[in-house]
Design a protein with these regions (language model features):
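The right-handed parallel beta-helix/beta-solenoid scaffold, focusing on the short coil/turn
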Residues: 145, 177, 188, 196-198, ...
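Right-handed parallel beta-helix/beta-spiral solenoid domain characteristic of secreted/periplasmic
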Residues: 152-153, 197-224
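Feature marks extracellular polysaccharide-active and adherence modules
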Residues: 182, 193, 201-203
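Acidic, low-complexity Ser/Thr/Gly/Pro-rich repeat segments typical of extracellular/periplasmic
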Residues: 2-141
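Acidic helix-start/capping segments at beta-turn-to-alpha-helix junctions
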Residues: 49, 182-183
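Acidic Gly/Asp/Thr-rich repetitive segments characteristic of extracellular carbohydrate-active
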Residues: 145-180
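Folded extracytoplasmic luminal domains of secretory or organellar precursors
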Residues: 156-158, 186, 190-195, 220-224
Length: 224
């Protein structure tokens, strides 16, 4: 595991370093001093802080995710592209349902995942436990039948799939449920099963965007 340190990471990460109420379904982001270049191989790992056990390994290039809630009788298995760079920011989408409520974690990034990058004015050589990108998730799941999703503001979930998982796991199939999406961009593949009365409404027609660059050679049909 990389041992380099980069000073105070607080303003540079999502969840921010030391955050105590992180979402289970949010993205990981790391903002560099300038635009990095993705390498040809490497991983991002999430570890449980209490015992250093690995809870997620996110690989460069294509990966497979299982959409749905933990223990569901049928999941949707999809290929997806979990790591990208936009401007100065490395953006990582962890796998579905790997984090738990009320747990503390830390993030590690292998050396070579990005190249030609500096972080807090230091050459980036990977990131491990000593860099202190730690966070603790929220204590408990939301309750009720009206759920709010926002990609950057206070809400019940960060992703639409997170809200759909909650509905599938906790509500009877004919129970009315409403998911409201605040304006933002939600780049995600989706799965909903055995629910007959779910309303998904965006804050506005023009600024609430749900999309993914899906195509037949990436995921044929609807997934397995």
């Amino acid at each position: 595991m990389p041992s380099a340190t980069y000073g105070d990471l607080f303003p540079l990460t999502t969840p921010f370093a030391g955050q105590q109420n992180a979402y289970l379904d949010g993205l990981l982001t790391l903002t560099f001093d300038d635009a990095p270049t993705l390498g040809t191989s490497g991983e991002v790992r999430i570890y449980k802080q209490s015992d250093d056990s690995i809870v997620d390994v996110i690989s460069m290039g294509g990966d497979i995710d299982a959409l749905g809630y933990h223990g569901q009788d049928k999941l949707r298995h999809v290929n997806y592209l979990p790591i990208k760079v936009e401007g100065n920011q490395l953006i990582v989408k962890p796998h579905n349902n790997v984090l738990e409520y009320g747990e503390s974690y830390y993030v590690a990034i292998s050396d070579g995942l990005v190249t030609d990058a500096s972080l807090n004015s230091q050459l980036f050589n990977g990131l491990g436990k000593t860099a202190n990108w730690t966070f603790t998730t929220r204590e408990a799941a939301p309750t009720g039948t009206h759920l709010l999703v926002d990609d950057d503001g206070e809400a019940d979930f960060r992703s639409l799939q997170g809200a759909l998982n909650y509905v599938m796991e906790n509500l009877p199939k004919d129970q009315p449920a409403t998911i409201t999406l605040r304006d933002g961009e939600y780049e995600e593949l989706l799965f909903l099963r055995n629910q007959n009365n779910v309303t998904i409404q965006g804050e506005s027609r023009d600024n609430t965007l749900v999309y993914y660059a899906n195509y037949d050679s990436l995921n044929s049909g609807s997934g397995d």
